[in-house]
Amino acid sequence: MTLPSSCAPLTGISRARLPAWALPDGWPTRANGEPLLADLAFRDGRIAALTPTDQPTPGLWDLAGALTLPGLVEPHAHLDKTFTIERCRPTQAGLLAAIHAMHEDRRHWTRADIQRRASAALARAAANGVTHLRSHVDWFTADAPDAWQEIARLDTGGITLERVALVPLPLFQDPVEAEAIARAVANSGERCLLGGFIHSSNWDAAAMENLLCSAARWDLDLDLHIDEELSEVSQGLTWLADHLSRHPFPGHICCSHGCALAAGSDEQAAPILRQLAAHGVTLIALPMTNLLLQDATFGRTPRQRGITLLHEAQAAGVATLLGCDNVQDAFCPAGSYDPLDTLACGLFSAQLSDLFDQQSRLICDRAALTGSPADAAPFAVGATACVVIFPGSDRFIWPLNSAARLVVNHGRLTHRRVWQEEMAHES
């Protein structure tokens, strides 16, 4: 494959192997059922045409059948905590011990420290092909922390960045305080959401009511850390499903984690998933961190996986995504800002199949994250010309052995990652 200049805008790509889920209805297929290759024409950084093809088209960059995805989505990160593992190691296993270690590390969170770590995370994500990233930011009081504004000031390197105020549920106990938090988030500018940490250790139904009501009044979407535990008595998702059946929420809701669904029975989970589907709620699974933190005891092999019910959610019609969650901090000492690593983890932990043609949607589906119908067709005419090309892979091995990639953002080749220079990139 001949590489084009990284400076000049591309006119388009030819003979790209796109995933079946992202193609329009009626797209032609080969005898073996695979979709026909595609031409994508670009104009002014956007897609001007999508057409099936068998032959290279003059004037377009010929990919010769290389696997090609839309820009990748990172639906759940923590830019305020990232890259702190060298100074922040929990003394016990599990989620609550990691939270305690994180609080101990906060004394180091100067503006310069946050800017340095978060900028490095965004640079890695961009080099891996991420074009949309949502970061939760911890709020410790009703006032916005320094990290909230510091992350807003970052040079995102072509990534659309969203911020979620991650607020402990008890801070919503007082309706006046709940209103003040929601107002502060709403006044923070575009792409800001309200969130909450909802766990059996801090459960409060009245606070949940205040959280949803204040978000609705201020026209805020929600992204909740909810039921991040393997407990049959956790109440977050059960309460939310029942509440939505009586009081539909006007915005979009994402529920991150949901590990407790895997601790109960199928009969308990089914009505919850039906309600989530009926109200357009998205379920975000976070396999790397949940595998490390759930059923965790030092010196003991875990018996439970800690992954939410991905297959059952998909069967019920719930939109689903996979996220990296924590990267190199007290919650997850490893991790990366490469969604392919997350999907590979999901492949084994959740026993996913048909990875490229169907489950790649878990790391690309902006509509599932935002709730916006405008994001539903990534290759539609008028969509931004953002693609990630995997020249050395095939649909049977992908996402493994697929570190080499080429990133096109708004119609320009922005990053090149090859085997010999694994993290090299050109801008």
Language-model regions, residue ranges each:
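C-terminal cap of metal-dependent C-N hydrolases
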Residues: 28, 361-363, 378-427
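Alpha-helical scaffold segments that flank or form the walls of functional sites
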Residues: 68, 85-136, 142-156, 180-186
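Histidine-centered catalytic micro-motifs
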Residues: 70-82, 137, 221-230
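N-terminal metal-binding scaffold of metallo-dependent hydrolase/deaminase domains
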Residues: 1-56, 394
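Divalent metal-coordination and catalytic microenvironments
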Residues: 40, 45, 65, 76, ...
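Active-site core of metal-dependent hydrolases
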Residues: 166-175, 187-305
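His/Asp/Glu-enriched, well-ordered alpha-helical/loop segment
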Residues: 242-253, 304-390
